Amino acid sequence: MDAHAINERYVGPRCHRLAHVVLPRTFLLHHAIPLEPEIIFSTYTRFSRSPGSSRRLVVCGKRVLPGEENQLASSPSGLALSLPLFSHDGNFHPFDISVLRISCPGSNLSLTVRFLYLSLVVAMGAGRNNARSPTVDGVSPPEGAVAHPLEELQRLARATPDPALTRGPLQVLTGLLRAGSDGDRATHHMALEAPGTVRGESLDPPVSQKGPARTRHRPPPVRLSFNPVNADVPATWRDATNVYSGAPYYVCVYERGGRQEDDWLPIPLSFPEEPVPPPPGLVFMDDLFINTKQCDFVDTLEAACRTQGYTLRQRVPVAIPRDAEIADAVKSHFLEACLVLRGLASEASAWIRAATSPPLGRHACWMDVLGLWESRPHTLGLELRGVNCGGTDGDWLEILKQPDVQKTVSGSLVACVIVTPALEAWLVLPGGFAIKGRYRASKEDLVFIRGRYG
């Protein structure tokens, strides 16, 4: 596949091994990954034995359909790309995580998909051990079968030409299929000469009679050579399952070609003797950390609500009816928003964007739009440029100009969280009601967040 071959050439030398994957349509729909020309795919590895991560590498991703790029009908189709893998002293740690980040420069799109090293390495090893030759529709031609004449010509075109067949009709037809160099053309008639030469005469212009005669030398022809990218068909592919989402995908193994030969070497795995924390804690370390911070934030919201006598203030100036039904609806939205936040463990959240923002963007705010009662998917990590969320009336008027905030205030079944660079956050509910909380993060937490998610 083109994407795998390009990554093998340009990304392969910058990592220890490449895992070539194909993400099918079901995987793309599950993770809401769009297929647009402007999308940028970048990957890096989060190490389980240290809080840091590897350098970020941009990889090539391309959509592949059955029958395209010389693919077989039985080949996997979807989004083809590669995941760089990094080893420790020659061994791969099974609990390291390869992170695929999908972003689009012209929009706020920022998605991350995680792949566990253990799943990738096991699938690569299984594909290597059970490699099979690609066949058409899964059926291999019987031994001794007579090939089609055109297939025989193609085989001869790829083979080294036999001098005995240089003047034969079969070689003439073969030469038409092969892009040969000048002078590598078989002629049917032995008396024909190269074009541009007249028998007995030279086409060189006569030397001028004026002045001393000078010998004219033709400059040597310029030869340009390049190594084209060979888009081979995978020798085999294995099904794999994403540990974090349960969505299936494919891992491709190639038989030959450059560094792809390393796919056939043993893949060393280094399991810790007594991992601390246990393996589930290493695999879901990011989820546990983010979920802990989300629960702490919800605790600050509930504490602020108790301090205010279990009341909510209307921060955004909008007109709404004042009756018991509206009060019950706002209360229900507040309880549902707290439940959603406790279960939201995503590194694309606004508070992580705020914690990892560069110093030049400290005057911006970030927002998460939450779909309550599973009414809509969440939209996380939206940047509100030029907005200051200090809590004053003027700040709320500026915030109200944001389209997503307007939909939240005037709608239902939705809430939003606005986070400042200082990690102060406001939960905004329909009707303009808002309550202030805070994400607790120590200096060590900020170093961990910036090194792992920045």
Swiss-Prot record:
Mind telling me which Pfam families this protein's record contains?
Herpes_UL17
GO (cellular component) term, any one: viral capsid
User: Which spans of this chain does the record mark as coiled coil?
Assistant: none
Q: What does this protein do?
A: Capsid vertex-specific component that plays a role during viral DNA encapsidation, assuring correct genome cleavage and presumably stabilizing capsids that contain full-length viral genomes.
Keywords on this record?
Capsid protein, Host nucleus, Late protein, Viral genome packaging, Viral release from host cell, Virion
Give the encoding gene's name: CVC1
Under the subunit heading, UniProt states:
Interacts (via C-terminus) with capsid vertex component 2/CVC2.
* Ranges for region Disordered: 197-227
One GO BP on record is:
chromosome organization
> Mind telling me what this protein is named?
Capsid vertex component 1
Cell compartment(s), UniProt: Virion; Host nucleus
Q: Which organism is it from?
A: Human herpesvirus 8 type P (isolate GK18) (HHV-8)
Protein family membership:
Belongs to the herpesviridae CVC1 protein family.
